[in-house]
From Swiss-Prot:
Pfam families attached to this UniProt entry: Dala_Dala_lig_C (PF07478), Dala_Dala_lig_N (PF01820)
Protein's UniProt name: D-alanine--D-alanine ligase
Residues given in the record as ATP binding sites: 204-266
Gene: ddl
HAMAP family referenced in this protein's UniProt entry, alphabetically: Dala_Dala_lig
GO cellular component: cytosol
Cellular localisation: Cytoplasm
Entry function: Cell wall formation.
Amino acid sequence: MAKKRVVVLYGGRADEHSISCISTAGVLGAMDTERFEPIPVGITKDGKWIINGEDPRGWNLDGGELPTVKITPESRPVMLDPSRGQDGFFIGEPSHINSADSGFGTSFVSMPDPEMHHALTSLGHVDAVLPVLHGPYGEDGTVQGLLEMMGVPYVGCGVFASAACMDKHYTKVVLGAAGIPTAPGVTVDARNFTAADVLAKIEDAGLTYPLFIKPSRAGSSFGVTKVEKADDRETQQDRLAAAIATAGEHDWKVLVEQGIDGREIECAVLCPKAGDEPEASWPGEIVLDHQNDDQFYDFDSKYMDASASHVEVPANLPVSVLEDVRDVARRAFKAVDGAGLSRVDTFVTPDGTVMVNEINTMPGFTPISMYPKAWDATGVSYTELITRLIEGVLR
């Protein structure tokens, strides 16, 4: 039987570019190459799609450096012709990558002119796409919409779920309509705000401190600030303004959320074929190993400091609470019309209440990521996980 040819997209224009690269190294290392022929296609930070760049299989975080998709002398541009569907992937010449006069430009995707097809080589028939892209321009429905338009099967959530879950404000709206609790908060426009008005909104909403201020459409803890209660209003406004400015560097839409007195418990959801009943893993917990009052799970704790935390699956909670988390995760996945995979992050309060923090529709696949670790602890190996996800969209 011929191997199914799978384009693996990685990199991208988002802040999470390097995390996508590390996730892809894990995915390619675990993919069953007896069944699938992976075709790695990198996306540079400025949006160029390339093939034959640096081999992502060799990337890791051991050296403390974050990898990026870079154009090499061997790189060739990948161009798309949406009208040709699964046969619409083409390779240009190396000189086309940076040549504005070539007609290929530097856009996110180009539709080659028929007269230019002679300068292109077909990438061949593509059976499916596995977009290992985190954050905007990859996990937010944009790439999913492109693949839908082309009629190319792809792994993961569709346009609506991807867009709704990328935007934490609208995640709250959808889950609230489904009766699923989330952390209380207010939304601020970082382009046009005064700290006094924000403080008034916080007080009107009855939010208690500490607060977590974060971009609405970013991941991997980029731009997140913990804000404690100050002794006076002027200091409080200064702290809020600084935190909103930090979040605003990543997104103009900013969430101000009440800190929850509870444990952060994550659950992996798997639904290879859209419409099937979703499965939930044993929930896990990121345990922080540097104990201090100000620590929270920021970007450096996640990726740059291996000694900062470790993963425990299942989390050290009563089985009844773990089952509640699994139930909430499945319900949340259904509420957003999820497909393929997601990681549902929850808070579990001391009284056992489970509320959703966020839904990641393309969770990290790095060696330290919760999603593959949770499924491995539930009895699904890394390789089996990827196989099921790909075969689900080929059925």
